[in-house]
Amino acid sequence: MLVWLAEHLVKYYSGFNVFSYLTFRAIVSLLTALFLSLWMGPRVIKRLQEMSFGQVVRNDGPESHFSKRGTPTMGGIMILTSITVSVLMWAYPSNPYVWCVLFVLVGYGIVGFVDDYRKVVRKDTKGLIARWKYFWQSVIALVVAFAMYAVGKDTPATELVVPFFKDIMPQLGLLYVLLAYFVIVGTSNAVNLTDGLDGLAIMPTVFVAAGFALVAWATGNMNFANYLHIPYLRHAGELVIVCTAIVGAGLGFLWFNTYPAQVFMGDVGSLALGGALGTIAVLLRQEFLLLIMGGVFVVETLSVILQVGSFKLRGQRIFRMAPIHHHYELKGWPEPRVIVRFWIISLMLVLIGLATLKVR
């Protein structure tokens, strides 16, 4: 919104022209979300404590987690608020890509909020019934997928970008909708599964968002898009603002979520952030890149699938406990060691993912 205001004021003072620069708005978007998150943190934590919105801990989990019982949860509210306010302030409100991400972010946030509410208020450890959770996730994802397909049909916006091959970009047609659905819903649940230790999910989210900020900038710049042999998408540049807002809000939240955590994001945060990352990947046509950069989320999800599949088929477990971060805890790794090592792996994967853009 401030961009539009600056455009009207620039005739009176040329300095307002700085608001038209994407790099400037990206920086202030990050800082706005960061400071909002830091400002909201103590207030949200205090309010959650007053309302007794404490974390529900499974009795069959690692013993070290029993001390987390009662820690305020649903802190994702401050992440979502910080991102939304920052994006509305610094992004062009006419950009359809921005609204797609915000729609998924808020929509999945509401689904996560209902799930958390049932857990912490109604003391229902299962939360929102799984089929209803997936139903609403699917509805939200399909609305965005069909909307973007209708707008970008038979254009580079619905092509499949294959890593390492610059000349292979098949037109997906209606398969675009199916791919978008699985990426958005899958990423949302993958981040949700990863959110099991203090700060474990938020830092890889920050790394991936930072990586996508660079990709969005290149995709929205015709010269760099042609240089990297990726589709040029004129609306993609504004996703830089969304990505930097996620980075800022994530870092602000980490201030309170780092070990030992003062607050957890809950499903209201993890489902929303995962859905937002999935949507950004789809809009940028970088679903394969998300698999690489979000490798930590992928491995966490695969560990659960393999664990459940192995137990049902063979009656045996592959890991001591799934998701895999619990496996390392039960092997005797201190929680901070698991967290930081997963962060390091995540950073490496993001750098590898960015490098693949040039290897074609």
UniProtKB/Swiss-Prot annotation:
GO terms for molecular function: metal ion binding; phospho-N-acetylmuramoyl-pentapeptide-transferase activity; UDP-N-acetylmuramoyl-L-alanyl-D-glutamyl-meso-2,6-diaminopimelyl-D-alanyl-D-alanine:undecaprenyl-phosphate transferase activity. GO terms for biological process: cell division; cell wall organization; peptidoglycan biosynthetic process; regulation of cell shape. Its main location: membrane. It is a multi-pass membrane protein. It is found in: Cell inner membrane. Its cofactor is Mg(2+). Pathway: Cell wall biogenesis; peptidoglycan biosynthesis. Pfam families: Glycos_transf_4 (PF00953), MraY_sig1 (PF10555). GO terms for cellular component: plasma membrane. Its EC number is 2.7.8.13. The chain crosses the membrane at residues 18-38, 72-92, 94-114, 132-152, 168-188, 199-219, 236-256, 263-283, 288-308, 338-358. It catalyses: UDP-N-acetyl-alpha-D-muramoyl-L-alanyl-gamma-D-glutamyl-meso-2,6-diaminopimeloyl-D-alanyl-D-alanine + di-trans,octa-cis-undecaprenyl phosphate = di-trans,octa-cis-undecaprenyl diphospho-N-acetyl-alpha-D-muramoyl-L-alanyl-D-glutamyl-meso-2,6-diaminopimeloyl-D-alanyl-D-alanine + UMP. InterPro entries: Glycosyl_transferase_4 (IPR000715), PNAcMuramoyl-5peptid_Trfase (IPR003524), PNAcMuramoyl-5peptid_Trfase_CS (IPR018480). Keywords: Cell cycle, Cell division, Cell inner membrane, Cell membrane, Cell shape, Cell wall biogenesis/degradation, Magnesium, Membrane, Metal-binding, Peptidoglycan synthesis, Transferase, Transmembrane, Transmembrane helix. Belongs to the glycosyltransferase 4 family. MraY subfamily. Catalyzes the initial step of the lipid cycle reactions in the biosynthesis of the cell wall peptidoglycan: transfers peptidoglycan precursor phospho-MurNAc-pentapeptide from UDP-MurNAc-pentapeptide onto the lipid carrier undecaprenyl phosphate, yielding undecaprenyl-pyrophosphoryl-MurNAc-pentapeptide, known as lipid I. This is Phospho-N-acetylmuramoyl-pentapeptide-transferase. It comes from Serratia proteamaculans (strain 568). The gene is mraY.
